[in-house]
Regions:
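A cross-kingdom feature strongest in bacterial/archaeal respiratory oxidoreductases
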Residues: 1-173
């Protein structure tokens, strides 16, 4: 049969320091996620996927800095307003998209856009959120600084009625 083997339950993988450190009340957190359709950018040159609305935001052809209504009010920003997302030693310029249900104090950006080498379809689509990543901050970081500008970048959204016929947004506790 088989010989005895000694097994350790300790993993050699370390959790990045940002996920172990609680953020302060005024500190913003960055969450990096793959785009639900073009993933890490490998499908950025597929026009059908670009035209498909993203599940929550209904955005097409672009990525944006997703923030909650309360965070947008606190920062004084509006939809389509450009902001600089800055972490120590790295930054990216992104348009804002306000998303009800997004966690307060968290800015989510989707990866896969802003590629320099792509085909005709994907050229010029979105911003490079990968510029905010490091090997220790692959999926998120705390200490994000958001610097607003007065420039705007139009975003394509397939939602016809932003207020949904004057109905108030669904509130949750």
């Amino acid at each position: 049969a088989f010989g005895r083997r000694r097994v350790s339950l300790r993993s050699p993988i370390r959790i990045p320091r940002e996920f172990g450190r609680p953020r302060g009340d005024d500190e913003l957190e960055l969450a990096l996620r793959p785009d639900p359709l073009i993933w890490d950018g490998r499908f950025v040159n597929n026009g059908w996927l670009q035209e498909t609305p993203r599940p929550v935001t209904k955005l097409t052809w672009d990525n944006a800095a997703l923030i909650s209504p309360a965070t947008a009010q606190k920062l004084g920003v509006e939809n389509e307003q450009l902001v600089d997302l800055t972490l120590p030693g790295r930054s990216a310029k992104a348009p804002v998209w306000i998303v009800p249900g997004q966690a307060d104090g968290v800015v989510t950006v989707q990866l896969g856009y802003g590629r320099r080498l792509t085909g005709r379809v994907g050229a010029g689509a979105g911003f490079d959120a990968g510029a905010l990543r490091t090997s220790t901050d692959m999926w998120g970081a705390t200490g994000l600084e958001v610097i607003k500008s007065y420039d705007r970048r139009p975003l394509a959204c397939t939602q016809d009625h932003h207020s949904m016929e004057d109905r108030h947004l669904v509130r949750h506790a």
